[in-house]
């Protein structure tokens, strides 16, 4: 895989959901870019940190990316945490990002309801998944969608695959080795403002990767719904 773009709603989404996959791609030599739509300033439970939460979470995400070996991190501006909607403006911003980065593969959040998981049903997650879907097809590949982007040198681009997480079904598992799992754990532990008990969170992460990998004989895994946009 030449270029992988992860598009997520909040700091920590990439690491909790796909940290092992992102670090594996980076280790194998792919260009890996992570984009975060909000700064997560409505997250956490410490009211004393609220005024600084966005700044703190950006720093946590930078350090988490370092743990994964991801060297390119993009933060969007103007999209408040907890208030993301599938707007025309956000579609345009993601189309511009796709055309700039030119990924073969996008990792993102599912736009579907998943009644088995409270976390997966965060409205920002579903909104980002819906916008990525609309941006990938047809807008990013259509020269007549957002024609002003052509003036910025952002030519149409076809994303070959999108892998969604958090939805009600999966059809693809990425194998993780122990190094991938350890990098994911280190990345998640950088998000100190979000998890009151980091040891408990680490145990949950380790169990989740074991559960995803075990049916396939893997040390660990991460599950996705894989969408091939080429047909």
Predicted regions and their residues:
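Metal-dependent de-N-acetylase/amidase catalytic core
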Residues: 1-5, 86-231
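Active-site rim/loop-helix segments in enzyme catalytic domains that contact anionic ligands
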Residues: 1-102
């Amino acid at each position: 895989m030449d270029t992988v773009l992860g598009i997520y709603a909040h700091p920590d989404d990439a690491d909790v959901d796909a940290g092992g996959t992102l670090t594996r791609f980076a280790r194998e030599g792919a260009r890996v870019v992570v984009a975060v739509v909000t700064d997560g300033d409505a997250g956490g439970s410490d009211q004393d940190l609220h005024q600084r939460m966005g700044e703190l979470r950006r720093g946590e995400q930078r350090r988490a990316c370092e743990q994964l070996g991801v060297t390119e991190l993009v933060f969007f501006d103007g999209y408040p945490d907890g208030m993301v909607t599938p707007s025309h403006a956000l579609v345009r911003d993601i189309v511009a990002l796709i055309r700039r980065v030119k990924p073969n593969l996008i990792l993102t959040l599912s736009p579907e309801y998943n009644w088995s998981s409270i976390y997966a049903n965060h409205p920002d997650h579903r909104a980002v998944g819906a916008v990525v879907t609309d941006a990938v097809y047809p807008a990013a590949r259509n020269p007549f969608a957002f024609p002003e982007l052509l003036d910025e040198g952002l030519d149409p681009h076809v994303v070959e695959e999108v892998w969604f997480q958090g939805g009600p079904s999966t059809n693809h598992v990425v194998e993780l080795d122990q190094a991938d799992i350890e990098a994911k754990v280190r990345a998640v532990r950088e998000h100190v403002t979000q998890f009151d008990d980091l040891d408990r969170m680490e145990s949950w992460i380790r169990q989740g990767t074991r559960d995803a990998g075990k049916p396939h004989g893997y040390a660990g895994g991460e599950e996705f719904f894989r969408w091939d946009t080429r047909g």
